[in-house]
């Protein structure tokens, strides 16, 4: 059983909250960005009776959130005096899932109802908070159908994986058409394989060499719908490319799209496996190495290399995010996309008992902790 | 005075030739590709009275011609028995300028006249020859207005430089709009600067560091129309990029296009200087290093990286080559593009006195020789 939203619903729903608490920052620090965070209790300046008030259910701690604290992320919120600070400050966090606990009487509430679960339409709204206040329903997307973990991560990983598959290639689902991607164990890559499978597109996922390769590959293939998983050493092996790859791909295979979130040699090797005049999209650079492309791929094979940035794409075209979430939810309801909960380690913020000091420590642990993706889940 | 075509016109024009002589190859050899070349005398199989017969005036020895002999070039002519060889063979060379010496009576001659100077529309026709035979005027482009050196090189370097500037960006010639390119001393780069200048686009040309930097930069700026020349060390210098570059570019500058024929660090450094959502076209890889692109340029700056290949582009769309040559000739006639003769070392093939052995040595020298671009000029 997935945790239902009910479990997180407060008995005090439908009331205007009084105690606002947010994780805020005024400055940036590259080395140890947890230093710039503090917990701030404040009274919002808005007239809450005329606002959409949201109770936070969960927020993930994403790499981009951390990069924002470090001051190295190109997209950032405006810092304001809204939280009664001495210096202009912003609330950390860019995505999360919320429950509507109070609505205005006018048209600005749109079709929202009390108890609806929503996510912010845009990044930079600040999500590391117990409550948030919005003025218009058009800045929110309803996600009642999604479980907690899917809803809290759909804006970044969900949209990224979905749009990478859906928005660039005019696929023929009757053909033998493939995506090749590196970092095949990442959260986004798992969305990619599931969305691709649902659309009749095959995926070749490259993962790092490891002792339990077969076991990991089996999970990616059986649970997440990867068509075939290969290792980075196979990816980089010219003999493999010549002799084995064509058997994996089958007859009349077209490898039309490469998805790169690693860079360096891995990016060159997935690009080499593309058909002529194909596309590589880069959306991450885990290896810290630049994207590396043999000149001949550009000149003689017509390769196009572009970037994908979920924040900018959906800022430019908010409707595309609304449409993506709608399609994502349909696929989720059909069982084509499973919850990412197994990939996530939850950190519990009990809004009744967790002290400010404990909350700060909790979030710092989420920022610095290794292993699974971290998500703060609020208990009410 | 540029050498005129008159000088190369034969007294025997308007006659059907009897002695065909071509540099041909049947096999390939990477290490020393001159080994596969031989001089072949033959009688063409076509009915020459029903053909367009061309006398060769000059042909350059291009890197792509050499790569074809090596067997490492993705575009290659079909090998045939047309030249009375034991093994199927092809004539070397992909561009050159010819004079029409015999025409058929029918419509296949189009608007060609005896004495017209022409170039082949497509690559892979074989140009290292004293005569060539074509069946239709639609396979030829008239270039009567160009001097020998411009005409013999317009298919590769001329088209490349012209199309790189003209075919990808919708320029605003009233704006402060820039192209940045590396290998600023190359033949193509010199076409780029001249075409750009004629179109009201500014060029920032990067050249390798050298003792006589100022002298070389001055020639590129004064003679070839580069707006500003900088060194690779300046290109790679972050302080230069921050403090000096904006002064060079001026107010409201837009660096909209990067042209890369070097690769490696140089490609990363020119790409960094582009505005957001800009384009880098790679058309060569002199450093033998792959195209290297910081991940952030793709993701956060919206960089698109593509390739340019003159052969494929004009094969796909022959009309675009015809249009390019037409525009090139107009610009040449206005004096916006000068002859590349100063960049070229000529090797003379006297069709009356040069023996086959001497001819082969001449061409081998052209293939292996360092320094200036080599062109074989035929004397009749």
UniProtKB/Swiss-Prot annotation, chains A, B:
Homodimer or in a complex with other proteins. Interacts with ARS1. Its EC number is 1.3.1.104. NADP(+) binds at residues 157, 185-188, 208-210, 283-286, 308-310, 373. One of its GO terms (cellular component) is mitochondrion. One of its GO terms (biological process) is fatty acid biosynthetic process. Belongs to the zinc-containing alcohol dehydrogenase family. Quinone oxidoreductase subfamily. Residues 1-9 form a transit peptide. Keywords: DNA-binding, Fatty acid biosynthesis, Fatty acid metabolism, Lipid biosynthesis, Lipid metabolism, Mitochondrion, NADP, Oxidoreductase, Phosphoprotein, Transit peptide. It is an enzyme of class 1 (oxidoreductase). This is Enoyl-[acyl-carrier-protein] reductase, mitochondrial. Catalyzes the NADPH-dependent reduction of trans-2-enoyl thioesters in mitochondrial fatty acid synthesis (fatty acid synthesis type II). Fatty acid chain elongation in mitochondria uses acyl carrier protein (ACP) as an acyl group carrier, but the enzyme accepts both ACP and CoA thioesters as substrates in vitro. Required for respiration and the maintenance of the mitochondrial compartment. The modification Phosphoserine is found at residue 339. Induction: Positively regulated by the zinc-responsive transcriptional regulator ZAP1. One of its GO terms (molecular function) is enoyl-[acyl-carrier-protein] reductase (NADPH) activity. It comes from Saccharomyces cerevisiae (strain ATCC 204508 / S288c) (Baker's yeast). It is found in: Mitochondrion matrix. It catalyses: a 2,3-saturated acyl-[ACP] + NADP(+) = a (2E)-enoyl-[ACP] + NADPH + H(+); (2E,4E)-hexadienoyl-CoA + NADPH + H(+) = (4E)-hexenoyl-CoA + NADP(+); (2E)-hexenoyl-CoA + NADPH + H(+) = hexanoyl-CoA + NADP(+). Present with 1560 molecules/cell in log phase SD medium. InterPro entries: GroES-like_sf (IPR011032), Mito_Enoyl-ACP_Reductase (IPR051034), NAD(P)-bd_dom_sf (IPR036291). The active site is at residue 73. The keyword Cytoplasm does not apply.
